[in-house]
């Protein structure tokens, strides 16, 4: 996947997000870039990376896997780990360039809050990796991509500001970063004294997301392995 368009997005997506934030908000580029990142750009990026990681095997009838002297479980876990590294890497790149620009524009988000926020985004998006991989193995690239991106766009803000936000895992990322980015999930600045500035939701949100990661990885492998055995 090193030379694919999806891999290039790991580097270009943060740059495009920063440019978009600057065009739309000028000196308030930080807030705009972070908001566009977790509401649209990052969901699309994670979905494309995850789907691209598995689509080649599906298109070749799983022969790429069957020919390897390695267990399918190790291949599945290895793909997930590779995507985890890419997800953290692209989030840290966004933080780096956004923070650098912040020194020349309005520093609306401090470097430390920006770093914590980007790490939280990575952690709370990880569970979608095995889910999209599984969907791709079952449905193909474009159906899985459309379903994943559509779910993010529709569900990421539903209930994000409610006490029951944890029931909607797609809303967890936009909720847990509120106190660090200082804005509502819709991008509007938080009012002083807003309950969304309370960081109590962070740990439960991360724990739920990581639990889903483990669950999706296990369920995904079981169903993926059944698909591999059909071609054996």
Enumerate the language-model features and the residues they cover.
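Hydrophobic alpha-helical transmembrane segments of polytopic membrane proteins
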Residues: 113-143, 211-219
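Membrane-interfacial helix-loop-helix connectors in multipass membrane proteins
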Residues: 97-118
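Short helix-to-coil transition segments within interhelical loops
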Residues: 65-72
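Pore- or pathway-lining transmembrane helices of multi-pass membrane proteins that form conduits
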Residues: 9-10, 139-159
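Aromatic- and glycine-rich beta-strand/loop motifs that create alpha-glucan
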Residues: 1-10, 226-231
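Terminal transmembrane helical anchor/hairpin motif
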Residues: 28, 150-231
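Selective transmembrane-helix segments that form parts of the transport pathway or gating/packing helices
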Residues: 72-101
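Long, hydrophobic alpha-helical segments
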Residues: 33-56
């Amino acid at each position: 996947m090193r030379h694919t368009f999806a891999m290039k997005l790991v580097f270009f997506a943060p740059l495009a997000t920063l440019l978009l934030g600057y065009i739309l908000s000028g000196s308030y580029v930080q807030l705009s870039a972070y908001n566009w990142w977790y509401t649209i750009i990052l969901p699309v990026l994670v979905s494309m990376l995850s789907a691209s990681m598995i689509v080649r095997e599906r298109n070749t009838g799983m022969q790429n896997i069957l020919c390897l002297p390695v267990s399918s479980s190790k291949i599945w876990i290895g793909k997930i780990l590779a995507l985890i590294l890419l997800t953290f890497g692209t989030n840290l790149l966004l933080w780096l360039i956004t923070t650098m620009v912040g020194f020349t524009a309005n520093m609306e988000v401090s470097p430390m809050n920006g770093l914590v926020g980007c790490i939280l985004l990575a952690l709370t998006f990880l569970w979608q990796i095995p889910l999209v991989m599984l969907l791709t193995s079952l449905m193909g690239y474009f159906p899985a991509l459309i379903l994943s991106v559509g779910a993010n766009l529709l569900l990421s803000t539903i209930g994000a500001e409610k006490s029951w936000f944890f029931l909607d895992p797609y809303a967890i990322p936009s909720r847990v970063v509120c106190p660090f980015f200082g804005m509502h999930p819709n991008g509007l600045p938080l009012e002083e004294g807003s309950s969304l500035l309370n960081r109590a939701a962070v740990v439960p949100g991360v724990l739920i997301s990581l639990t889903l990661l483990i669950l999706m990885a296990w369920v995904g492998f079981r169903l993926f392995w059944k698909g591999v055995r059909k071609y054996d």
